Amino acid sequence: MMNPVGFRFRPNDEEIVDHYLRPKNLDSDTSHVDEVISTVDICSFEPWDLPSKSMIKSRDGVWYFFSVKEMKYNRGDQQRRRTNSGFWKKTGKTMTVMRKRGNREKIGEKRVLVFKNRDGSKTDWVMHEYHATSLFPNQMMTYTVCKVEFKGEETEISSSSTGSEIEQIHSLIPLVNSSGGSEGSSFHSQELQNSSQSGVFANVQGESQIDDATTPIEEEWKTWLNNDGDEQRNIMFMQDHRSDYTPLKSLTGVFSDDSSDDNDSDLISPKTNSIGTSSTCASFASSNHQIDQTQHSPDSTVQLVSLTQEVSQGPGQVTVIREHKLGEESVKKKRASFVYRMIHRLVKKIHQCYSISRT
């Protein structure tokens, strides 16, 4: 329902109860109120998901909904207030809604609730819940009107909504078991970020280059999946002997990918590989870089190898970097695009350092 500029749907308490809530409960034809206020199960959605369910789109941080009263227990009048992310907590006393004209009788009640996270911390989401009182003993008031308000900034609504969508996507990704019964897990790729010391990457072989223009990412990955080969290789990197070379400073660190976003970090396994090094980025000069790939048939899941690197170096000695296979882990094909993206990012980082060293 599109609204003209300046239009506001702001009924007062009496109008909400008399002109919307009571007809919704008592009239046989409720189309005249349903086209203004949508009916939802409030506790089936998080507060930040409710604005998209509103019949009238508002940027003022106020939305109206009809909701069915759902009791927490079979006996008593305690309503269900809990959602997946938190719960609605009643604050203050129940207020009476009176008819301002005529006999000024009581026509309903209003309760104020605040949404709290699971840990009990308050949020900026507030709800005014309206209940119509029965004028006659046989009247059943099934519906309530929920006036949902957001007291924070508008940008916080969009960020909360995005976070909810991401959580939903992650919940849809199932854990898969391989044919051998081992549980599938994800592959974590890590990178080295240079700090105050400068480093040079040189002689990167053409096999590690990925041409996005010639081969689309999806097609190249499908080709990798459909390869029937069953080969596994451990690649040893040898660095040339330099008798005149002395390491600048001993460095020990963890390879981390600062460029990865929250989506990627949620998808991967919490297992990380730490890499101990005893030289700076400059010690990687004249090294040959190759990417080891583990291939499997399309009928089986893809196997990825987590690698740890042990580096031993001294003046006048040959540096040997061995990559040991820690374990073969199967992953679902739906996660293949994520793994490819992480490897692609690693290769791009190496190319950037290589380009800097050439200038």
Swiss-Prot record:
Single GO MF annotation: DNA-binding transcription factor activity
Gene Ontology cellular component annotations, sorted alphabetically: nucleus
Pfam family, one: NAM
Coarse class of the protein's main subcellular location: nucleus
Domain NAC stretches: 3-151
Swiss-Prot/TrEMBL keywords: DNA-binding, Nucleus, Transcription, Transcription regulation
Keyword Nucleus on entry: yes
Entry's localization field: Nucleus
Domain notes: The NAC domain includes a DNA-binding domain and a dimerization domain.
Full protein name: NAC domain-containing protein 4
